[in-house]
C-alpha cells in the first residue's frame, strides 16, 4: 500500500541505487553489445514470443549468471509509466535503471530489455539485483484496471518459466514485490495486485508456444487517462 507521504518518482529512486551498482566489480557491457530491437538476446535467454528491446548498456551490468551469482528470486514491479515510456526510459543512457522484462497491460505482450545472465538495476538493492529477475508491469498501483487478465496470465507464464529454469520455488518467499526488497522506498506492486491469483497462475500455467502476433512496441497505451496521468507517481 502506498505511504501517506509523497515520494519522488520511482524512476528517480531507482536511479540512485543504480549509480551504486555501477561501482560494483562486474564490468559494464560495452555499447557494441546493444542489439537491434527485433533481435533476440544470445545465450538462450529469450522465451518464445518475447520481443527483444534492449536497454542501454549504461543501465545494467554485464555478468555471467547463474555461474557468477545464483538467481533465486523474481521481483514484481509496476511501472508508474506507460509501456512505451518505460521502454524509452530503459533505452536512455542517462536513466541508470532497467528491468529484465516489461509486460504490457492491454494484451500481455512482453519485452525483454536485459539478458537474464546480466544484472538489471531494478530492485534498489545490489544484492537483490544480482540474485533476481525483475519484471515490470505497465500500470499505476492505485488503478487496478491496468492489471488485466492478459497481463496476469502472460506474466505468470513468464515467471513460471523463469522459476523452472533456475529451480526457484513458486511461493511468496521467492516471488516478491519491489516493496519487499530490504531498504526499498517503493510500494509496488501495491495493494491492488492480486497475489493469490498470480501465484495460482504461476503454479498452474506453463510457457506455451502460442502463435501470437508481434505488436509494434510503440502502439498506443490502453484506453484511459494514461497520458493525463503520466506525471503521477507513488
Model segments located where?
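Basic/polar, cationic surfaces and motifs that engage anionic cell-wall
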Residues: 2-9, 37-54, 141-234
Amino acid at each position: 500500500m502506498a505511504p501517506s507521504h509523497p515520494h519522488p518518482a520511482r524512476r528517480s529512486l531507482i536511479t540512485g541505487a543504480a549509480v551504486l551498482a555501477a561501482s560494483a566489480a562486474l564490468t559494464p557491457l560495452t555499447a557494441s553489445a546493444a542489439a537491434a530491437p527485433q533481435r533476440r538476446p544470445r545465450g538462450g535467454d529469450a522465451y518464445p514470443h518475447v520481443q527483444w528491446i534492449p536497454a542501454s548498456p549504461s543501465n545494467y551490468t554485464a555478468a555471467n549468471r547463474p555461474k557468477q551469482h545464483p538467481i533465486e528470486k523474481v521481483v514484481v514491479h509496476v511501472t508508474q509509466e506507460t509501456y512505451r515510456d518505460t521502454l524509452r526510459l530503459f533505452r536512455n543512457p542517462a536513466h541508470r535503471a532497467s528491468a529484465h522484462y516489461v509486460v504490457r497491460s492491454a494484451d500481455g505482450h512482453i519485452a525483454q530489455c536485459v539478458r537474464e545472465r546480466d544484472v538489471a538495476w531494478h530492485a534498489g538493492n545490489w544484492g537483490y539485483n544480482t540474485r533476481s529477475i525483475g519484471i515490470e508491469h505497465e500500470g499505476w498501483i492505485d488503478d487496478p484496471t491496468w492489471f488485466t487478465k492478459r497481463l496476469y496470465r502472460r506474466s505468470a507464464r513468464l515467471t513460471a518459466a523463469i522459476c523452472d529454469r533456475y529451480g526457484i520455488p513458486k511461493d511468496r518467499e521467492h516471488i516478491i514485490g519491489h516493496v519487499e526488497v530490504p531498504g526499498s522506498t517503493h510500494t509496488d506492486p501495491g495493494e491492488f495486485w492480486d497475489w493469490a491469483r498470480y501465484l495460482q497462475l504461476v503454479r498452474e500455467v506453463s510457457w506455451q508456444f502460442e502463435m501470437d502476433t508481434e505488436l509494434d512496441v510503440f502502439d498506443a497505451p490502453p484506453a484511459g487517462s494514461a497520458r493525463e496521468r503520466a506525471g503521477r507517481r507513488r
